[in-house]
Each structure stands twice: as structure tokens, then as C-alpha cells.
From Swiss-Prot:
Pfam families tied to this protein: Mur_ligase (PF01225), Mur_ligase_C (PF02875), Mur_ligase_M (PF08245)
Sorted UniProt keywords: ATP-binding, Cell cycle, Cell division, Cell shape, Cell wall biogenesis/degradation, Cytoplasm, Ligase, Nucleotide-binding, Peptidoglycan synthesis
Biological source species: Ruthia magnifica subsp. Calyptogena magnifica
Protein name in UniProt: UDP-N-acetylmuramate--L-alanine ligase
UniProt family annotation: Belongs to the MurCDEF family.
Length: 469
């Protein structure tokens, strides 16, 4: 195995990332840098991630140019990078290999005990919980996560052990490059359908192929409560462990209750001689499901139950996953501020349910930025139904994520549809900074203010706190 690593390093020591500023790309880049590869990258955006990589010693360019790759032996591209990118064109001219992010991740995983977490929703939180438990168990894993761990402030780390924990991204089907030892499938939902020719069966088939990449002695941990997962269970031909709230699952959560910002429940698993009480430092039934998946992985690694319990009780979460930013003082109104990455109707519904169960007597004021024209079009009716359950709704313009506009698909159209189907009267604003002038006339004392979306709406919490605390 060491000989194979040396061959790879001798031939591919200089690695250049096009689009290095994303969480997935930066995580792989950081691990490779810490393995003493020469890492460079380009990204038109400067952010905390690129600043961190630069401080570590990576060469970062904030403009795409063919000269950026003059020393590169391999080019790694994110799914957002198109074939007409100047650096990609030059690489092809020079016969420099151009590989997708997941193929480089697969190469890292090939030399380790890989644990890959797949699913339309919940990947980042599940990956983070598994990582946290292994850290508490002093197993020192390598991890690459699509979000920032609140406990450490980072999304990737090179560990000393053979364990590598990573998210498996189905959005471009690149997760099929991965060959882990253990895997999780949290759910299968209608999203990124352009990749799958708008055919839901193609999406399900991809998850079946993903599970087939496991060795015959591996295991796939799957959420049997999810309809999409249930539909492929009989097509999985690897050792299988199911989890959920329903009877008949291998790992089952029972006796669920919420106290403040924590969830309490018991776990039934035939590997345990008795029910195991869990205190989870997160809210929401969706996070209980994420936790059950993590427990399934950790049982396969023979981590003791007392360590799992301890880790879950002090897990501090992931950035932009129901982040609580304290209270804002807006015209003497005390408003609790939450921020979440949710951008799919089912994710939004889970966040709404969690907050409404926690703050049953308070209004939910929601600021949402739709993400991608195609997703807004494909899930339009679901967005209308889900967003209509907010008490107050403010919509930002759709964040395009490099997509071209689609006729009649915009936030105003979405707002009009919500007005027709409910008593809600959404407000549409063009610029996130306009929120500062809008909020004082909207919020009441003790409202819950929720920021939602995967685009540049992430700037809002700091903007609001700098003006209203």
C-alpha cells in the first residue's frame, strides 16, 4: 500500500484545484497539503476558506488563468467548473489529467478505511456526528465534510488512523467513484434531476450502484423510514443495516421527547442487550435519524456505547445547520436569530417543524433565498406548500449558482403562487442588505427570525448582528 502511495506522489505531486473555495474541494486540498503534496488552486471568490488555505501555504489565485497551472501534474475540478474554463482548456492542451473532485477523494479513500455518507439530505450533519464520535473515541480519523464543525471551526483534517470519513455527493453522480468500506444512505429525494435525465428511477439506480461499490464484507446503513430508500432495499446486495422510528428496523429510536434545545430518546438494536438512552445536543426528528445512522457506523467499528452517549451529549453541531445566533434587538423587540442551509422543501419542512415544536407560542419570520432556477421550477408546488406555513415570509431573488434564468421562474412568481394558495403575503426583495430597512416594520417582540438558503444569504447573520446587537 505504501508503494502505491509513493507511485502516486512521484507522478502527481503538484495538484491544482479549479474552484478551490468550496467546502468539498477545500477539504480535499487541505488533506493533500498536509500529506505534503504541493497544492495550488483558483477561485474567483475570496472567503474564509481560501484565506485559511493560503495561510497554510497553498498558492491561491483569485482569477482563472492558464498560467495558474504551469506547474500542475493533475487538475481537480468541482462540478461547478465548465469545460470552457481557461485552466481546464490549457490542461487538456498539455495532456494534464483533469479529474472530478470525487475521483481525487476516491484516490485518498483507496488507501484507507473509507466511510462514505450519501443521501439527498442530512449528509453533512451525519458525517459530522460520525467524525465527532470517532474523535471522542480517540480514533483520530481523517475527515472531509461539506460544512464547518462548530467544535473545531474546520471542515477537514488529516488524522493518524486509517479511517477516512467523507460525504458522497450524488448531485453530479460523482459519488460512484467512491469505494468505501462502510456507507450510509440517509434518504433519496427528487433533486439534481438534470444529472439523471429527470428520471427518478435513474436516481435510485445510482444509489444502488453506489452501494454495490462496497466490498462484500462491508455494510450499508440505510434509513428504512425514507420512501425512496425503501424502494431500493431489495436491490441492495451487500450487508445491510436499517434504521428509523418504525418497527422492523435494525436500529430504532423510541421514547422520543424534546426538552429545550435537546432531544432525548432510547435506541433499540439487537447488538445491545438493553435500550440505550441518548441525549442529543440538537433538535429535530431529522437529527435523530442522522444520529441513528452514525450509531450504526460506530457499532460496526465496535465503539463502546458509553463513548457514543458522551459524544452525542456534547456534539455542538455544524455551521449553518440550525445555528442559533442569539438575540437581536430590533426597535426594542427581542428576536431570536437562527440560520440554516436548507434549500429543498423537505429540508425546509424539517427546520420549520423543529423550531415550531421548540417555540410553540412564537411567530416564525422566514427569510428565504431560493437556490437554482431548475430546483425552483422542478419543486415549485412543494416550495409553495412548505413556505406557506411560515408566519411571515421574505423572499430574496433566486441564487442562480451559475444557471441561466428560466422563463417565468423567479421569486415574484413563487410569491404570487403562495398568495393564491394561502393567507400569506410574501415580500420579495432583490438585495440581502435591504433586509436592514425592512425588518424593523415587520418583527415583534419574541419572534423567531429564520434565515434559509444555500446562496449568498449566508452573509445575513453577521450583517444583522452588526446592526442589531
Amino acid at each position: 500500500m505504501k508503494d502505491l502511495r509513493m507511485v502516486f506522489k512521484s507522478r502527481m505531486n503538484n495538484i491544482h484545484f479549479v474552484g478551490i473555495g468550496g467546502s468539498g474541494m477545500s477539504g480535499i486540498a487541505e488533506v493533500l497539503h498536509n500529506l505534503n503534496y504541493s497544492v495550488s488552486g483558483s477561485d474567483i471568490s475570496q472567503n474564509k476558506i481560501t484565506d485559511r488555505l493560503e495561510k497554510m501555504g497553498c498558492q491561491i489565485y483569485h482569477k482563472h488563468h492558464q498560467d495558474n497551472i504551469k506547474n500542475a501534474q493533475v487538475i481537480v475540478v468541482s462540478s461547478a467548473i465548465k469545460d470552457n474554463n481557461l485552466e481546464v482548456i490549457k490542461a487538456h492542451q498539455l495532456n494534464i489529467p483533469v479529474v472530478p473532485r470525487a475521483e481525487m477523494l476516491a484516490e485518498l479513500m483507496r488507501f484507507r478505511f473509507g466511510i462514505a455518507i450519501a443521501g439527498t439530505h442530512g449528509k453533512t450533519t451525519t458525517t459530522s456526528i460520525i467524525t465527532h464520535i470517532l474523535n471522542v473515541a480517540e480514533l483520530d480519523p481523517t475527515y472531509i465534510i461539506g460544512g464547518i464543525l462548530n467544535s473545531s471551526g474546520i471542515n477537514a483534517k488529516l488524522g493518524e488512523s486509517d479511517y477516512l470519513i467523507a460525504e458522497a455527493d450524488e448531485s453530479d453522480a460523482s459519488f460512484l467513484h467512491l469505494q468505501p468500506m462502510l456507507s450510509v444512505i440517509t434518504n433519496i429525494d427528487y433533486d439534481h434531476m438534470v444529472t439523471y435525465d429527470n428520471d427518478y428511477q435513474n436516481l435510485k439506480d445510482a444509489f444502488i450502484k453506489f452501494s454495490a461499490n462496497l466490498p462484500f464484507y462491508g455494510a450499508c446503513i440505510m434509513c428504512a423510514d425514507d420512501e425512496g430508500v425503501n424502494e431500493i432495499l431489495n436491490s441492495i446486495h451487500r450487508p445491510l443495516i436499517t434504521y428509523g422510528f418504525n418497527n422492523g428496523t435494525d436500529i430504532q429510536a423510541v421514547n422520543v421527547k424534546q426538552v429545550g434545545m435537546q432531544m432525548y430518546f432510547d435506541v433499540i438494536y439487537d447488538k445491545y442487550t438493553k435500550q440505550i438512552p441518548i441525549k442529543l445536543n440538537l433538535i429535530g426528528k431529522h437529527n435523530i435519524l442522522n444520529t441513528l445512522a452514525a450509531i450504526g457506523i460506530c457499532c460496526e467499528l465496535n465503539i463502546k456505547t458509553n463513548i457514543i452517549q458522551k459524544a452525542l451529549a456534547n456534539f455542538s453541531g455544524v455551521a449553518r445547520r440550525l445555528d442559533h445566533h442569539g438575540k437581536l434587538n430590533i426597535n426594542n423587540a427581542q428576536v431570536s436569530l437562527f440560520d440554516d442551509y436548507a434549500h429543498h422543501p423537505k429540508e425546509i419542512s424539517a427546520v420549520f417543524e423543529s423550531l415550531k415544536n421548540t417555540y410553540q407560542d412564537k411567530r416564525l419570520v422566514v427569510i428565504f433565498q431560493p437556490h437554482r432556477y431548475s430546483r425552483t421550477r422542478d419543486l415549485f408546488d412543494d416550495f409553495v406548500y412548505t413556505l406557506s406555513s411560515a408566519d411571515i415570509l421574505i423572499l430574496l431573488n433566486i441564487y442562480p449558482a451559475q444557471e441561466k434564468p428560466i422563463a417565468h421562474i423567479n421569486s415574484s412568481t413563487l410569491a404570487n403562487a403562495i398568495r393564491r394558495s394561502s393567507g400569506l403575503n410574501p415580500m420579495v426583495i432583490k438585495n440581502p442588505k435591504e433586509i436592514l430597512t425592512v425588518l424593523p416594520s415587520i418583527v415583534n417582540n419574541n419572534d423567531i427570525l429564520l434565515i434559509l438558503g444555500a446562496g449568498d444569504i449566508h452573509i445575513l447573520p453577521d450583517l444583522l448582528k452588526s446592526n442589531y446587537i
